[in-house]
A protein has these predicted regions:
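Short, strongly hydrophobic alpha-helical membrane anchors
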Residues: 17-38
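Cysteine-centered motifs
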Residues: 6-8
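Terminal, non-globular segments
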Residues: 32-249
Length: 249
């Protein structure tokens, strides 16, 4: 899901980390923060490139609608990044960002699962995917609204659901081997990026409450993993957009 900025660390947590550790440890933590800032910049760049790569496809009537409107996905991510930056520099109430971020999860879930579902060739697998979409949407909505106990639970569930959908896509490929090379198919690269992103993100998201409360020195590592997973996803999206050129030739 275009990236949901789940690990926006509060200043109070950072102060607690800095007060607790020795100078060498603080230097290590600072190094992770610098790396995190670098990766965040790369993340910005890849998301923006992805947006422009796909918005160019919108007017191309020869492409299927799922590719033509895929620019909507990175556009929501860019919006969240802007809101996060405004929040960081106190130009925006952070509650606005938090709620926008949480409810954007519904868009990410619906858009990605829809994109994957329409690429499924096997009728039984597609029917299964459609049923899962109908069942899981209200579950995620309820978690967004009512979950107050377990931090990031709604994100964990959403990413696990997306992982299931990407797995269905790969099963479908094995059952219905494409005539073209996989590496020339835009959808393959897009869904591969979504798959890798989910695989990398699920463990740190699932452990986030434990880490934030008990091992705050590892927050930087978790943010690094998160940024890396999203960078890989957007690079895969860009590759998918470039593959559309072969479809037009």
């Amino acid at each position: 899901m275009g990236f949901l900025r789940c690990f926006c660390v509060e200043k109070t947590v950072i102060r607690r980390v800095n007060a607790h550790f020795s100078l060498p440890k603080m230097a290590e933590i600072r190094g992770m923060e610098v790396l995190g800032e670098l990766l965040e910049t790369i993340y910005w760049i890849t998301a923006i490139i992805s947006f422009f790569a796909f918005i160019k496809l919108y007017s191309n009537k020869s492409l299927k609608i799922s590719l033509r409107i895929f620019f909507l996905y990175p556009s929501i991510t860019i919006l969240l990044m802007i809101l996060s930056t405004l929040c960081k520099y106190e130009y925006l109430d952070c509650d606005v960002f938090v709620y926008t971020n949480k409810y954007s999860l519904l868009f990410h879930f619906v858009f990605l699962t829809w994109f994957i579902t329409i690429e499924l060739k096997d009728s039984k697998i597609r029917k299964t995917a459609k049923s899962l979409m109908i069942l899981l949407f209200p579950l995620i909505l309820c978690l967004i609204i009512y979950n107050q106990e377990i931090k990031f639970l709604e994100y964990v569930v959403a990413y696990m659901c997306v992982f299931i959908f990407t797995s269905l896509y790969f099963v479908d490929i094995f059952l219905n081997i494409p005539e073209k090379q996989l590496t020339t198919i835009p959808d393959f690269w897009i869904i591969l990026g979504i798959f890798v992103n989910a695989v990398i993100l699920i463990p740190p998201l699932a452990l986030s409450s434990i880490v934030i409360n008990n091992y705050p020195n590892y927050i930087g590592l978790m943010k690094t993993l998160t940024s890396l997973s999203v960078i890989i996803m957007y690079l895969s999206f860009i590759k998918g957009a470039l593959c559309t050129r072969t479809l037009q030739n």
